[in-house]
Amino acid sequence: MKEYRVYLERARSRQQDFLYPLIFREYIYGLAYSHNFNRSIFVENGGYDNKYSLLNVKRLITRMYQQNHLIISANDSNKNPFWGYNKNFYSQIISEGFAIVVEIPFFLQLSSSLEEAEIIKSYKNVRSIHSIFPFLEDKFTYLNYVSDIRIPYPIHLEILVQILRYWVKDVPFFHLLRLFLYDFCNWNCFIPSKKSISTFSKSNPRLFLFLYNFYVCEYESIFLFLRNKSSHLRLKSFSVFFERIFFYAKREHLVEVFSKDFSYTLPFFKDPNIHYVRYQGKCILASKNVPFLMNKWKHYFIYLWQCFFDVWSQPRTININQLSEHSFQLLGYFSNVRLNRSVVRSQMLQNTFLIEIVSKKLDIIVPIIPLIRSLAKAKFCNVLGHPISKPVWADSSDFDIIERFLRICRNLSHYYNGSSKKKSLYRIKYILRLSCIKTLACKHKSTVRAFLKRSGSEELLEEFFTEEEEILSLIFPRDSFTLHRFHRNRIWYLDIIFSNDLVNDE
């Protein structure tokens, strides 16, 4: 982001902190191209890198300079000359430019707040999503109730733009942003359809993720305000994420908003043992206290979304359950708190007592049905879990086919290695193994049995089941008892920051 700072300082010297002129600068789109070129190989870019050229950028900027081309026809936006014949391509370029420009001031604010707090090093530790699981193991065993909440979606994009205007004071920039969103999403109705939102998010991932994350950050900042008001304990771990939007400077305004929007005064309560975890569009609220207090938090969330963000949320979509009797889905796992009962014999003098001890343990299970559904969607098996061949990969070499299957199996094995029960994982690996064999047999136009007998590939395909043991043998001594003990325990790969589509099935 150093080049971001340089370009923003250059723009500040010309225009007084306005973002609007940056949209017409070629280097902004060069930064967007660099971001697309350097991102993960697992993410498809939809041909953006192949079609990008400086000539196309100059042509797009020229079109935007011609103000008569910015007039939108509400009846038929597809004929708008602003986009010409390459509407999808130009919209993708300009959305990347919008994302780069709007991220600059927020990144600079976040960097300054992190430097002042001297927590740059600790901030890097929160990159891994797998840090959630050790947190669950440490905290959730002491809690009793959990509420599985899905954040309301979709939200009207006009509300997102209005929320963003609170923090960036540049009216021309937001007029152009609103014009772009209006033209692409076709805002002829009050609420855009899920199909239009989905299309917008897939072709413009960076801008969509920024707007959506900003909406989530705004709602979580208000939730943090309620949480701090309801308890004497401050959430130190949350302060890093909310200082970037200057939340504490907005506290007095929030009090006025709540007093106007809510029909009654919010009766705050003391609940120091509440924990909040969010990933993607879901969040989990867990507490040690009685369900009455959890119901209060449930209504706070509903009224917050309805009054502050104009998003309708049904009370029945938020369920409150006991952790010992309910499994909640998070990060591709099914998790619950299992009660382990044991009886201890105690003797005092000549009297003998039987004492029943109940201990809690976080039970994390591999969800077999969602994984089979994902494998069926990727054409590795049918909906019943029966392996099928992958004819699309038949043009590759035998080594490449086996390596592709092994890579998927390796990712799944690493991701779900922390589960307490691995039988479901072994079944998934078995499906991938047979699918690989059938793909190779299909390529060589043979049956599975004849192919294995002729090529002797059975030993090679044993890597699907022996690879994890070989990895552990590099870390721990090659001792059968040691490996067996570690296979029974959980090993979290905390350096994994990317999960493929097969494990991201929520």
Swiss-Prot record:
<keyword id="KW-0507">mRNA processing</keyword>
<dbReference type="GO" id="GO:0006397">
    <property type="term" value="P:mRNA processing"/>
</dbReference>
<protein>
    <recommendedName>
        <fullName>Maturase K</fullName>
    </recommendedName>
</protein>
<keyword id="KW-0819">tRNA processing</keyword>
<keyword id="KW-0150">Chloroplast</keyword>
<dbReference type="GO" id="GO:0008380">
    <property type="term" value="P:RNA splicing"/>
</dbReference>
<dbReference type="InterPro" id="IPR024942">
    <property type="entry name" value="Maturase_MatK_N"/>
</dbReference>
<comment type="function">
    <text>Usually encoded in the trnK tRNA gene intron. Probably assists in splicing its own and other chloroplast group II introns.</text>
</comment>
<dbReference type="GO" id="GO:0003723">
    <property type="term" value="F:RNA binding"/>
</dbReference>
<comment type="similarity">
    <text>Belongs to the intron maturase 2 family. MatK subfamily.</text>
</comment>
<dbReference type="GO" id="GO:0009507">
    <property type="term" value="C:chloroplast"/>
</dbReference>
<dbReference type="Pfam" id="PF01348">
    <property type="entry name" value="Intron_maturas2"/>
</dbReference>
<dbReference type="Pfam" id="PF01824">
    <property type="entry name" value="MatK_N"/>
</dbReference>
<dbReference type="InterPro" id="IPR024937">
    <property type="entry name" value="Domain_X"/>
</dbReference>
<dbReference type="InterPro" id="IPR002866">
    <property type="entry name" value="Maturase_MatK"/>
</dbReference>
<keyword id="KW-0694">RNA-binding</keyword>
<keyword id="KW-0934">Plastid</keyword>
<dbReference type="GO" id="GO:0008033">
    <property type="term" value="P:tRNA processing"/>
</dbReference>
